[in-house]
Amino acid sequence: MKAIFITLEGPDGSGKTTVGTLLNQKMEEAGIDFIKTREPGGSPISEKVRNIVLGIGNEEMDPKTEVLLIAGARRQHVVETIRPALAAGKTVLCDRFMDSSLAYQGAGRDMDMEQVLQVNLYAIEDTIPDRTYYLDVPAEVGLARIAANKGREVNRLDKEDISYHEKVQAGYEKIIKMFPDRFMRVDATMQPEEITEVILADILQQLS
């Protein structure tokens, strides 16, 4: 069985974390040799950067600083975690990657998405996902889910208003048009178990 690089993307409240946990279990049951990781983070240095980028109290962070910090964390994640796993024949399942920067920092912060893309391509070089699952949910539904989930860790981006999250969603639509071959859109208004089964079926097909 070949190894591939898989990413989960979607706006806040799309259920990525829940689906990622279920998918982790289902992939183990299917006998897939893989690692599960996340961004920002995924390596010791990158996790430290995550705390800075998402930390409450850092609301004054300049948008370009945000882009560069996340790209730096991504570089370390690629070098320390993702590439070694792929080289060892392990599939990589990652909660967010480059596309999140294009959507959240590029579109969400009204920055030039092409510039954000080039910064990230410099960081990751040829380590580009083979398959990206976009969990599609309306911005207002996602924010309502966040508000209802009292146990969820609140980060700096959660405090943005709905207009920011709508721009993020519009950004994702542009990204899907930029990279149509690797994206699969999944209706995230379905139950997490249903979403997981849809994604797992496609993963098994990609690995065959």
Swiss-Prot record:
One Pfam family here: Thymidylate_kin
Enzyme class: transferase
Positions that bind ATP: G10, P11, D12, G13, S14, G15, K16, T17
CDD domains hit by this protein: TMPK
Disulfide bridge positions per record: none
Catalytic activity annotation: dTMP + ATP = dTDP + ADP
A biological process from GO: dTTP biosynthetic process
GO cellular component annotations of the record: cytosol
Keywords, comma-separated and alphabetical: ATP-binding, Kinase, Nucleotide biosynthesis, Nucleotide-binding, Transferase
Gene Ontology MF annotations: ATP binding; dTMP kinase activity
Keyword ATP-binding recorded: yes
NCBIfam families: DTMP_kinase
PANTHER family in the cross-refs: THYMIDYLATE KINASE, UMP-CMP KINASE 2, MITOCHONDRIAL
Family listed: Belongs to the thymidylate kinase family.
Job of this protein: Phosphorylation of dTMP to form dTDP in both de novo and salvage pathways of dTTP synthesis.
Name the UniProt record assigns to this protein: Thymidylate kinase
Organism: Listeria welshimeri serovar 6b (strain ATCC 35897 / DSM 20650 / CCUG 15529 / CIP 8149 / NCTC 11857 / SLCC 5334 / V8)
